[in-house]
Amino acid sequence: MAKEGIKLIANNKKARFDYFIEETYEAGVVLHGTEVKSLRMGKCSIKESFMRIENGEVYVYNMHISPYEKGNIFNKDPLRVKKLLLHKFQINKIVGQIQQKGYTLVPLTIYLKDSLVKMEIGVARGKKLYDKRQDIAKKDQKREAEKDFKVKNL
């Protein structure tokens, strides 16, 4: 995500730990002015958020955007349902994928691309407990190898 003109706002690490991400999409987010200002300050959480497709449109629920401090009466509800902007063929493809048993749609990251707020969403399949244990074991092995390498270089 360290590309030119992209500023990461929030990352959903738990989604990558709990799911196998099969395919990702970039979607625009429909927001009001004070929500954008709050996002630019980095006050957003997508840990507990989830997505639904209703009437051919994708919505994000429980995405918490803290109220803008100077927003007074213009502030919206922090947990307001937000609409995502995707092409019709992308939505149809996602619907076909998540109708399969075990697949769901999860928010992965939210970021600013130039001046636009974008969300990376993924079609995901849930991991079993042993898959999570394997990931933890791999992470520990990698950490140990880096530690040994660092000691040898001194």
From Swiss-Prot:
KW Oxidoreductase (keyword) present: no
Organism domain of life: Bacteria
Assigned keywords, A-Z: Cytoplasm, RNA-binding
One GO term describing the cellular component: cytosol
SUPFAM superfamilies registered for this protein in UniProt: Small protein B (SmpB) (SSF74982)
UniProt keyword Cytoplasm present: yes
GO process annotations (BP): trans-translation
MF-aspect GO terms: RNA binding
Ranges that cross the membrane: none
Compartments (UniProt record): Cytoplasm
InterPro entries xrefs: SmpB, SsrA-bd_prot, SsrA-bd_prot_CS
Purpose: Required for rescue of stalled ribosomes mediated by trans-translation. Binds to transfer-messenger RNA (tmRNA), required for stable association of tmRNA with ribosomes. tmRNA and SmpB together mimic tRNA shape, replacing the anticodon stem-loop with SmpB. tmRNA is encoded by the ssrA gene; the 2 termini fold to resemble tRNA(Ala) and it encodes a 'tag peptide', a short internal open reading frame. During trans-translation Ala-aminoacylated tmRNA acts like a tRNA, entering the A-site of stalled ribosomes, displacing the stalled mRNA.
Family membership noted in the UniProt record: Belongs to the SmpB family.
PANTHER family: SSRA-BINDING PROTEIN, TMRNA-BINDING COMPONENT OF TRANS-TRANSLATION TAGGING COMPLEX
The protein, known as: SsrA-binding protein
Organism the protein comes from: Lachnoclostridium phytofermentans (strain ATCC 700394 / DSM 18823 / ISDg) (Clostridium phytofermentans)
